[in-house]
């Protein structure tokens, strides 16, 4: 697929004529911003013709950036490259226009592959903008929208809110129900308790002690840092392919019934699907030692747990870590894996989040030279990580021509890093994007749709 870039420009925030231009402001990063993945994430939408005009999309982008100013600012780093915050300087978002001489249906892949990297701005090198957008028009009139954002500025919950608001602005509607900008972090938002109460261990969970760092670099504004993306460029990394497993609503219902048999309250859709994929991956990987442990890293949203203000824009995620042995995963029924997942997520409760705030505010991180464990790797085996987008309103992005015909993550070939996404069919089915080694793919397919 040959993509021809037509233009690249900055789109700066626009403000109502009656409003005074806001002043430049520095927003310090919260402990949740600093502990998450410091990288660029990318997603891709496709819209059927007749699609919205570029002018309407650009106008909507300028309007929504005027409300979500964090996405129009620039990341600020310290002398060692550490994240300090975002300066709200109205630098703007990068907008790239491109075209493809062919039909979207004939050319664009249905699952992440190196080809889709051409449908969004590059994630390599220094990136001065928090947000980048690429609008790729196909000869058939279809439009692909590639969106990238710095994960250290906002999590998936916040980003999905931004995208829905962008669509509203492009249609000439109010960005949100209220005129006020969404709340973001400020120094008094996540205060430690007095006295602090660190009830749980956070060393070896959210933080680890790295080897001595190399010589630091000067602080800077803008630009990416460290382990940014992990998508492997145009060539597959280590023979890893991304398989798209489509679970129908009926299959999920039967899976939940099997997992929840004899249980008063059935396991959730997420718990059931993840338990099934965990067991399937364990089998496909050919892990032979029954005593070997496998762990999943699961994102847990802390907005309700910490009673964050409505519409909070930033990162507010920690992780649950269910663990089981290979022998238990393969030798015990599906309900065992689902229960392990359920219990681990339940332990990441309000008390755990408050303990983390107290620990992160105690000075131990700086004093002991601790670093976040949220660092991308090429291979996770025997472990897994899951990003669940099942409850985010990504499909509500509508620029005026209707909702997208498909939506998926970009190409991130980290073996074992799963994405769970509602199917574009809108019928309750779920798509799981599963990076596996090529030599394990057939084994995964053979047991993926088996209900034991």
Swiss-Prot record:
Alphabetic keyword roster: Acyltransferase, Transferase
A GO term for molecular function: acyltransferase activity, transferring groups other than amino-acyl groups
InterPro entries, per database record: CAT-like_dom_sf, Plant_Fungal_Acyltransferase
Tissue specificity annotation: Highly expressed in roots. Expressed at low levels in flowers.
Listed EC numbers: 2.3.1.-
Keyword Hydrolase: no
UniProt feature, compositional bias: Basic and acidic residues: 222-234
Residue numbers spanned by region Disordered: 213-234
Reported induction: By wounding.
Active-site residue list: 151, 398
Disulfide bonds: none
Recorded family membership: Belongs to the plant acyltransferase family.
Role played: Hydroxycinnamoyl transferase that catalyzes the transfer of an acyl from p-coumaryol-CoA to putrescine, to produce coumaroyl putrescine. Can use feruloyl-CoA, caffeoyl-CoA and sinapoyl-CoA as acyl donors. Seems to be able to transfer the acyl group from feruloyl-CoA to the acyl acceptors agmatine and spermidine.
Name of the molecule in the record: Putrescine hydroxycinnamoyltransferase
Species annotation: Oryza sativa subsp. japonica
UniProt lineage: Eukaryota, Viridiplantae, Streptophyta, Embryophyta, Tracheophyta
């Amino acid at each position: 697929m040959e993509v021809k870039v037509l233009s690249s420009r900055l789109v700066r925030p626009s403000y109502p004529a009656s409003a005074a231009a806001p002043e430049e402001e520095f927003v310090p990063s919260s402990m949740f911003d600093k502990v998450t993945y410091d990288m660029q994430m990318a997603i891709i939408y496709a819209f059927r013709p007749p699609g919205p005009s570029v002018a309407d999309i650009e106008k909507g982008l300028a309007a929504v950036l005027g409300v979500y100013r964090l996405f129009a600012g620039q990341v600020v780093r310290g002398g060692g490259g550490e994240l300090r915050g975002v300066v709200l300087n109205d630098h703007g978002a990068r907008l790239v226009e491109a075209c493809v001489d062919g039909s979207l249906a004939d050319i664009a892949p249905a699952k992440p592959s190196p080809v889709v990297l051409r449908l969004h701005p590059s994630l390599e090198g220094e990136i001065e903008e928090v947000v980048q957008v690429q609008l790729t028009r196909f000869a058939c009139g279809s439009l692909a929208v590639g969106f990238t954002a710095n994960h250290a500025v906002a999590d998936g919950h916040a980003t999905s809110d931004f995208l829905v608001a962008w669509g509203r602005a492009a249609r000439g509607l109010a960005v949100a129900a209220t005129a006020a900008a969404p709340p973001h972090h400020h120094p008094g938002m996540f205060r430690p308790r007095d006295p602090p109460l660190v009830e749980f261990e956070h060393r070896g969970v959210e933080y680890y002690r790295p080897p001595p760092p190399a010589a630091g670099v000067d602080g800077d504004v803008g630009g990416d840092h460290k382990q940014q993306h992990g998508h492997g460029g145009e060539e597959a990394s280590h023979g890893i392919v991304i398989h798209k497993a489509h679970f129908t609503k009926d299959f999920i219902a039967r899976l939940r019934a099997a997992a929840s048999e004899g249980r008063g309250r059935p396991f959730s859709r997420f718990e059931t699907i993840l338990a099934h994929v965990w067991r399937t991956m364990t089998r496909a990987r050919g892990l032979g030692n029954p005593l070997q442990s496998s762990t999943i890293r699961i994102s847990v949203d802390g907005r309700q747990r910490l009673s964050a203000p409505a519409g909070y824009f930033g990162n507010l995620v920690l992780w649950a870590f269910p663990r089981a042995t290979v022998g238990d995963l393969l030798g015990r029924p599906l309900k065992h894996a689902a229960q392990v997942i359920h219990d681990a997520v339940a332990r990441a409760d309000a008390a755990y989040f408050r303990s983390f705030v107290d620990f992160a505010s105690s000075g131990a991180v700086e004093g002991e030279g601790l670093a976040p464990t949220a660092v991308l790797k090429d291979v996770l085996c025997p472990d897994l990580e899951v990003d669940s987008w099942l409850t985010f309103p990504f499909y509500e992005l509508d620029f005026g021509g209707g909702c997208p015909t498909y939506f998926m993550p970009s190409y991130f070939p980290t073996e074992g890093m799963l994405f769970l996404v509602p199917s574009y069919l809108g019928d309750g089915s779920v798509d799981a994007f599963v990076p596996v080694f090529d030599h394990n793919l057939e084994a995964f397919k053979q047991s993926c749709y088996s209900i034991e």
